């Protein structure tokens, strides 16, 4: 007996898992994990499946994290939110804004659950989760012990954290603590946001602009399956960036604090005339080259082949090698996504 994973991944790829368990509290997560472990099965915890690509049938148990609840504590200088890992991220952004607690608006419409946000250190339009994260509560799967990691202990990086490294497969995230400062400062460094006046802009205007940019450029997973940005924006050494800018002076680039330079993967892909290119049922989105879509009953092999093609074309033209942001899941767990498309 197997269960289809199609409803549980936004790519809409039709693979199966041996078991699927829905967990509404910590105990249910632990019970499902212990049961799978006793049976010698692999086990993974999934939010809304908006950042994964299942490469094949999963041989174990998929636990759907559905822990809910939002608590707010106000202090003199900030609002402190304690949010269940299974809450929808965008609904949280709206909730905060509706209750006059700004600070999350640049992160509007990022798909997925709150519990997934620290794993990737989600980010968009100049803001990353680490800017507002206070702590992450998790439970050790083997012992059932509760842990609270401060933001510093989460070791956030660009689309990276301790949860993708030492703590991968060892803990389940049960809640995230956010600190939204009452001294709100808009971040208007990207896209249409640069046109807004920092002196008069409201959080609602930032939210509206972000939603407009995302809905006009990004495909709706309900129409064309996708996992949002498929590739990370590459971060390269300054000398490589200089070399590239000598050849392509109009290439978007964002100097980083450590001297490296972040490039725009979407622009690099676009320069290779790859928008609309298809392999099997998978396609490069026509509006946003960074997004690969399930255009016509794509298989995971189609998506991997297309990602490989994109990576090769960009690498040959720019000598910059893209890495997937999407996590690749094999038969018994996560596999190296770069190796899968190299």
Swiss-Prot record:
What are the record's GO terms for cellular component? cytosol
Can the keyword Ribosomal protein be found in this entry's annotation?
no
The metabolic or biological pathway listed in the UniProt record of this protein is: Cell wall biogenesis; peptidoglycan biosynthesis
**UniProt keyword terms in alphabetical order:** Cell cycle, Cell division, Cell shape, Cell wall biogenesis/degradation, Cytoplasm, FAD, Flavoprotein, NADP, Oxidoreductase, Peptidoglycan synthesis
Which reaction equations make up its catalytic activity? UDP-N-acetyl-alpha-D-muramate + NADP(+) = UDP-N-acetyl-3-O-(1-carboxyvinyl)-alpha-D-glucosamine + NADPH + H(+)
State a single Pfam family of this protein: FAD_binding_4
Q: Which GO terms describe its biological process?
A: cell division; cell wall organization; peptidoglycan biosynthetic process; regulation of cell shape
Q: Which GO terms describe its molecular function?
A: FAD binding; UDP-N-acetylmuramate dehydrogenase activity
User: Per the record's keyword annotation, is GTP-binding included, yes or no?
Assistant: no
What subcellular compartments does it reside in? Cytoplasm
State its Enzyme Commission number(s).
1.3.1.98
The FAD-binding PCMH-type domain sits at: 13-183
Class in the EC hierarchy, top level? oxidoreductase
Q: Which residues form the active site?
A: 159, 229, 325
Membrane spanning stretches: none
This chain's function reads: Cell wall formation.
By sequence similarity, the record places it as follows: Belongs to the MurB family.
Record PANTHER family: UDP-N-ACETYLENOLPYRUVOYLGLUCOSAMINE REDUCTASE (PTHR21071:SF4)
What is the protein name given in its UniProt record? UDP-N-acetylenolpyruvoylglucosamine reductase
Q: Which organism is it from?
A: Salmonella choleraesuis (strain SC-B67)
């Amino acid at each position: 007996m197997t269960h289809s994973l199609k409803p549980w991944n936004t790519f809409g790829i039709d693979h199966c898992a041996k078991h699927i368990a829905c967990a509404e509290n910590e105990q249910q997560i632990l019970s499902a994990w212990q049961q799978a472990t006793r049976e010698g099965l692999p086990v993974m915890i999934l939010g809304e499946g908006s950042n994964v690509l299942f490469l094949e049938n999963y041989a174990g148990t998929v636990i759907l994290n559905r822990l809910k609840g939002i608590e707010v504590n106000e202090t003199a200088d900030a609002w402190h939110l304690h949010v269940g890992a299974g809450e929808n991220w965008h609904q949280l952004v709206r909730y905060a804004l509706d209750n006059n607690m700004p600070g999350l608006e640049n992160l509007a419409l990022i798909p997925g659950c709150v519990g997934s946000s620290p794993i990737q250190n989600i980010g968009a339009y100049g803001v990353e989760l680490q800017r507002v994260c206070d702590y992450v509560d998790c439970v050790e799967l083997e012992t059932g012990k509760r842990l609270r990691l401060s933001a510093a202990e989460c070791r956030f990086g660009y689309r990276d954290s301790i949860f993708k490294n030492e703590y991968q497969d060892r803990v389940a995230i049960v809640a995230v603590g956010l600190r939204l400062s009452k001294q709100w400062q808009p971040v208007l460094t990207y896209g249409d946001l640069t046109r807004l006046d920092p002196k008069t802009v409201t959080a609602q205007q930032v939210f509206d602009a972000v939603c407009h940019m995302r809905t006009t450029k990004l495909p709706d997973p309900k129409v064309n399956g996708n996992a949002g940005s498929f590739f990370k924006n590459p971060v390269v050494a300054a000398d490589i960036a200089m070399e590239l800018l000598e050849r392509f002076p109009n290439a978007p680039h964002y100097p980083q604090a450590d001297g490296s330079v972040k490039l725009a993967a979407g622009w690099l892909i676009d320069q290779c005339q790859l928008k609309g290119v298809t392999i099997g049922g998978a396609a490069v989105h026509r509006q946003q080259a960074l997004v690969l879509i399930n255009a016509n009953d794509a298989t995971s092999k189609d998506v991997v082949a297309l990602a490989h093609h994109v990576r090769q074309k960009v690498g040959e033209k720019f000598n910059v090698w893209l890495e997937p942001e999407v996590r690749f899941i094999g038969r018994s767990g996560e596999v190296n996504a770069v190796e899968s498309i190299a």
